[in-house]
Structures are given as structure tokens and as C-alpha cells.
Amino acid sequence: NVDDPGIIHDADTPEDYAELLRAHNQSLIRSEIHIQLAREKVFFDEQLYSLLTLIQETGSVRDACEHMHISYSTSWNLIRTLESQLHKPLVSRSQGGVNGSHSELTPYGEEFLKRYARFSEETRNCSEKIFENCFRGFFNA
């Protein structure tokens, strides 16, 4: 008696294959870690990491907001809260002019993002190892 649907069922059509893939993916269990930084309250999370990364890539807070579907005022509130918690500016702003306004991360902001990315990656790697040690073979039993 075989319990593997990949052996029992044909995958001759795209629909059959899609169903097998759906069943396989549904059977995968993994841990999910969300990294946040806090003092009394959370002041930095993955959403703000994405916002700052987009500001650096686009050179524009407004463009970053459009990509993330958040309001311009919300983004500035998040940035101001972060900067007040770290006591340093992370985003430098230049006003209008011929080429319009421009924003970019300060050197401190760039270093902060690098360190957060490293911390996040190392935390996820440790979490995966711990998850594997705690649950290896458990869900397949």
C-alpha cells in the first residue's frame, strides 16, 4: 500500500499536476519568524525595512509609498518615529527644484539596514535549525 499521491495519481494534465503541487505544498510545514525592534513599543519591522529599501532604490519617499500602497503621511510618521528612537536621521531629504525632491538613506541609515538584514537572516537560519531539531519526522508520522 503506497501513501504517496505522486505515485498513485497520474499527472497527465496541467490540472492534475496543479492538484498534486497544491497537495504537496499544503503538506509542508515551516516556521514563520517576523523580526521587530522595540523599546516600549515596536518601532521597526519588515514593512519599514521594505519602505527604507525602496526609498534607497527609487530616491523618492512618494514612489516608495506608491509601491507599498501606504500613504505618504503614514510613511513619514513611521520614519520620524524610527529616527526618534535611534536618535539619528536615517533618511536625508532635499526639496524640489528643477529635478524635484529627492530622498536617500544617510550612511547611518544604510548601515542600519545592513545590520537589520544580517540580524534577520541569522535569526531565520537559527530558527530553521531549531524547528528542524524539534519537529524532524513529527509531521510525517
Which residues fall in each region the model found?
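Helix-turn-helix/homeodomain-like alpha-helical modules used for DNA recognition
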Residues: 110-141
